[in-house]
């Protein structure tokens, strides 16, 4: 079973819906633009998120974008202790994969990484915070997916 390591999110006004949760990569990237009142007091990430962030600087040839992505990776490494993708997460991935397949969608490519993050949340028994809730719609009833909005109520489109 995974141990939940996390950061404390400062509270501005009201208490969040959850005490803890797992942030997907979109939340980590946009963390400074999100309404922190909607985030749990303890927020953790999956090692899969670190893998996505580590690949980011290598996925562009634009030097300024490489630097921005490297900064995001370094901030995430300094801020979060990542939950490992362990045997419990691997077993949970089977359930996630089955739910996505039953919904008629494929679990391939970049989407597969999102589903590995969802499996980490399922194994940890924590809700998954994302900017792309539509990417996880087949997981209703399996993993609680929480939309992380900007202070202006904006979500990202499906990526």
Question: For each of these PLM feature ranges, what is it?
Answer:
Residues 4-21, 31-119, 137-156:
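PIN-domain endoribonuclease scaffold, especially VapC-family toxins
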Residues 24:
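Conserved catalytic-loop position in the HRD/HxD motif
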Residues 122:
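Anion (oxyanion) recognition and catalysis
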Residues 131:
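Conserved acidic donor-binding loop of glycosyltransferase catalytic domains
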Residues 134:
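Flexible glycine-rich beta->alpha loop in the catalytic core of nucleotide-sugar glycosyltransferases
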């Amino acid at each position: 079973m995974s141990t939940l390591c996390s950061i404390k999110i400062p509270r501005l006004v009201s208490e969040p819906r959850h005490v803890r949760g797992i942030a997907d990569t979109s939340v980590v990237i946009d963390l400074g633009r999100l309404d922190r009142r909607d985030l749990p007091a303890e927020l953790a990430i999956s090692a899969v998120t670190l893998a996505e962030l580590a690949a980011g600087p290598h996925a562009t040839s634009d030097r300024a974008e490489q630097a921005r992505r490297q900064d995001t990776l370094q901030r995430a490494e300094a801020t979060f202790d990542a939950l490992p993708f362990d045997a419990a997460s691997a077993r949970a991935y089977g359930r996630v994969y089955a739910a996505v397949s039953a919904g008629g969608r494929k679990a391939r490519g970049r989407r597969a990484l999102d589903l590995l993050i969802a499996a980490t949340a399922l194994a940890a028994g924590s809700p998954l915070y994302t900017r792309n809730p539509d990417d996880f719609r087949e997981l209703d009833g399996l993993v609680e997916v929480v939309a992380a909005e900007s202070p202006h109520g904006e979500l990202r489109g499906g990526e």
